[in-house]
Amino acid sequence: MAGKVILDFEKPLFELEAKLEEMRVCLRGSAREQDQQDADMLHRDIALLEQKVDALRRSIYKNLTRWQKVQLARHPERPYTLDYIYMMTRDFVELSGDRHFKDDKAIVGGFARLEESASGFSQTVMMIGHQKGRDTKSNLYRNFGMAQPEGYRKALRLMKLAEKFRKPVITLIDTPGAFPGIEAEERGQAEAIARNLFEMARLSVPIICVIIGEGASGGAIGIGVGDRVFMAENSWYSVISPESCSSILWRSWNYKEQAAEALKLTADDLLRQGIIDRIVPEPLGGAHTEPEAMAGTLKEMLVEELRDLMSKESDVLVRERVDKFSGMGVWDE
């Protein structure tokens, strides 16, 4: 299994895999010493252990709790926005700045070419998404994927540019939330997010939004209004993180597992509620185990939906998008 970071629920699997690797090393040693009898016994033991490993892997990843999916969504080796852009598209040209204050590195975006050779599909699209870092230095540079007002204003500028040139918009969402600092509030964080919701609802080109990791609160919905909303199988999308919910309701972070269950924040939950449209299947073990395969799956789904959305008139797109989001939730008059 790829990756060096081991989550707590993965430890039994990694221990078995380590034992399996030790046996394979012993087998190679037996082969050099030409001890055929020992080698045959090791072959049988390895085959049995491989079956146990496969069974345990399926047992773990096919029965993940909501909190465990939150942990996978935060896996530090999981593909981020730029990873998907470079794996799914070509000729990406990053565009910077909101033309008001500065360039927010927590959100990246630009034009790219989305192609599928099998079907002959080829389309220039505007790619926009949250970007996290891989280590402390890059996370500080990217502000841990927490966008400031200028990040959302940059995203809106790029969406308007895409609308001007009649190009579809694809947003990739992966954030623990919008940056909550005083300076962000002073520069109009709430207004910037609200403005994006208003403008995205009536943008005249197709919009597809994909939650690829964390989808926390207004930070996520700020680039999350689309004709189609996808969620990666092991991502989460909620008004609040399980830890914050736990600290509010129980005055402690120790109840984050219960909070995750109560929030119903997984892709399966949100598909049942009609909040999202499709789930992007992940390789067994998470997107980080086979990032190229994950990107290929997502690309196929994007192409399929873009074919449908690009055949619709602009007024139909806007009307259906507004109706889609207006129909969410339950209320009493």
Swiss-Prot record:
UniProt similarity note: Belongs to the AccA family.
Task: Provide GO CC annotations from the record.
Answer: acetyl-CoA carboxylase complex
Q: Which reaction does it catalyse?
A: N(6)-carboxybiotinyl-L-lysyl-[protein] + acetyl-CoA = N(6)-biotinyl-L-lysyl-[protein] + malonyl-CoA
Query: What do we know about how this protein assembles, alone or with others?
Result: Acetyl-CoA carboxylase is a heterohexamer composed of biotin carboxyl carrier protein (AccB), biotin carboxylase (AccC) and two subunits each of ACCase subunit alpha (AccA) and ACCase subunit beta (AccD).
Question: Where, subcellularly, is it found?
Answer: Cytoplasm
Which species does the entry assign this protein to? Chlorobium limicola (strain DSM 245 / NBRC 103803 / 6330)
Please name the GO terms of the biological process aspect recorded for this protein, alphabetically: fatty acid biosynthetic process; malonyl-CoA biosynthetic process
Which ranges carry the CoA carboxyltransferase C-terminal domain? Answer: 48-308
Keywords from UniProt, A to Z, are: ATP-binding, Cytoplasm, Fatty acid biosynthesis, Fatty acid metabolism, Lipid biosynthesis, Lipid metabolism, Nucleotide-binding, Transferase
Pathway the protein acts in: Lipid metabolism; malonyl-CoA biosynthesis; malonyl-CoA from acetyl-CoA: step 1/1
Q: Does the keyword Cell membrane apply?
A: no
Entry EC number(s): 2.1.3.15
Pfam families for this protein: ACCA
Q: Name one GO molecular function term.
A: acetyl-CoA carboxylase activity
Designated name of the protein: Acetyl-coenzyme A carboxylase carboxyl transferase subunit alpha
Q: Which lineage is the organism of this entry classified under, starting from the top rank?
A: Bacteria, Pseudomonadati, Chlorobiota, Chlorobiia, Chlorobiales
